[in-house]
């Protein structure tokens, strides 16, 4: 066998082997993920049809207008029919791709109804970890998540340090978590099982390890799990602050109580720097050989008092928004939810206002640039 054939066989085998892998986005376990799979396959098939048509036309024209065929000159200066066709076809292609895509995007942002009894979970990113706070159940987990099957879960995405992206491929698409704001993202698991979630936005050394397990169980098993979680150690502020320190050696933890009792990350984006100071953690060159070198100077116990709830987000102060502090003995009631919704509405207005301001600046700049012509 020639060297070329050997290489061809080798690369062909590699291509076939790739089909043996479990592509998570093509193995959906929720309605949003199923919708995403449909869009992916629809787009691929649509593009393959277009490519096949182009290759067929290319072959036909290559043969028809070959040098040896003296009956066809191949010269054409104008043809209204053909020009209309190759204008209309791309428009049809764009419309055919846009309609299901736009429809899906609107479905993704649709909020669940009260009768659906959605479960609310605050998903907070910090220190290459994910903190999941259950405000109604008064429990918190680190790097693992348990949800009931067939029940919508409203994730309230927040970040306490770098911008990250919350993604559970088998349940749906990703959405960014950023400091100083809260982003809603609703997902539902239609099957029981364990799925993998991750941060899909590169944010440093621990990016590849910022993952979490998602356990989808029946409602009765979820209630049993909540009862067991409430028996765990209470999450106090000292423990939470130490967990905020960046580390690539993360563990799955469960606590009773939540960090919502003493900090609202959206209202107090500077909180994490105070936590660093309490444990003498200093940001250094991240490329250490071992985790011990990275955290060599970190204290076992804090040398400063716990920080009281504060508002350091200028937008909160400017728009009269309140910090969402929910004590471990306080109910996640309608009053709290109303204030929560109010803050979300205000953040949307701020976002829209920023877009309008940016657009007006661009328009003004274009006007000034065009004024001299």
UniProtKB/Swiss-Prot annotation:
Membrane topology: Multi-pass membrane protein
Cellular component terms per the entry's GO annotation: plasma membrane
EC number: 1.10.3.-
Chief location bin: membrane
InterPro entries given in the database record: CcO_II (IPR045187), CcO_II-like_C (IPR002429), Cupredoxin (IPR008972), CuRO_UO_II (IPR034227), Cyt_c_oxidase_su2_TM_dom (IPR011759), Cyt_c_oxidase_su2_TM_sf (IPR036257), QoxA (IPR006332)
Bias kind Basic and acidic residues: ranges: 292-320, 339-373
EC category name: oxidoreductase
Reactions that this protein is recorded to catalyse: 2 a quinol + O2 = 2 a quinone + 2 H2O
Record key words, sorted: Cell membrane, Electron transport, Lipoprotein, Membrane, Oxidoreductase, Palmitate, Respiratory chain, Signal, Transmembrane, Transmembrane helix, Transport
Stated name of the protein: Probable quinol oxidase subunit 2
């Amino acid at each position: 066998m020639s060297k070329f054939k050997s290489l061809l066989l080798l690369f062909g085998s590699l291509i076939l082997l790739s089909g043996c892998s479990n592509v998570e986005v093509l193995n959906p376990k929720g309605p949003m993920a199923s919708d995403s799979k449909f869009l992916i396959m629809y787009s691929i098939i649509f593009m393959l049809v277009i490519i096949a048509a182009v290759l067929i036309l290319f072959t036909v024209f290559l043969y028809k207008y070959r040098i040896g065929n003296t009956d066809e000159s191949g010269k054409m200066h104008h043809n209204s029919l053909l020009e209309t066709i190759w204008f209309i076809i791309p428009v049809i292609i764009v419309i055919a791709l846009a309609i299901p895509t736009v429809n899906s995007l609107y479905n993704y942002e649709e909020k669940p109804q009260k009768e659906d009894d959605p479960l609310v979970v605050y998903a907070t990113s910090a220190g290459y970890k994910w903190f999941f706070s259950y405000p109604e159940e008064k429990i918190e987990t680190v790097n693992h998540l348990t949800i009931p099957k067939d029940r919508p879960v409203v994730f309230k995405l927040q970040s306490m340090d770098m911008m990250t992206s919350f993604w559970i491929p088998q349940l749906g698409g990703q959405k960014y978590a950023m400091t100083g704001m809260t982003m809603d993202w609703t997902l539902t698991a239609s099957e029981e099982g364990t799925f993998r979630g991750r941060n899909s936005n590169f944010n440093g050394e621990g990016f590849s390890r910022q993952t979490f397990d998602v356990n989808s169980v029946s409602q009765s098993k979820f209630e049993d799990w909540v009862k067991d979680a409430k028996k765990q150690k209470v999450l106090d502020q000292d423990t939470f602050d130490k967990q905020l320190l960046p580390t690539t050696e993360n563990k799955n933890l469960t606590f009773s109580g939540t960090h919502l009792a003493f900090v609202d990350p959206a209202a107090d984006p500077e909180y994490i720097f105070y936590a660093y100071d309490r444990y003498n953690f200093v940001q250094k060159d991240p490329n250490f050989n071992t985790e011990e070198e990275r955290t060599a100077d970190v204290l076992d116990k804090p040398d400063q008092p716990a920080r009281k709830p504060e508002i350091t987000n200028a937008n909160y102060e400017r728009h009269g928004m309140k910090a969402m502090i929910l004590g471990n003995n306080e109910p996640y009631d309608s009053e709290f939810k109303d204030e929560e919704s109010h803050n979300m509405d205000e953040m949307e207005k701020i976002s829209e206002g920023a877009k309008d301001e940016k657009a007006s600046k661009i328009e003004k700049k274009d006007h000034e640039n065009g004024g001299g012509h």
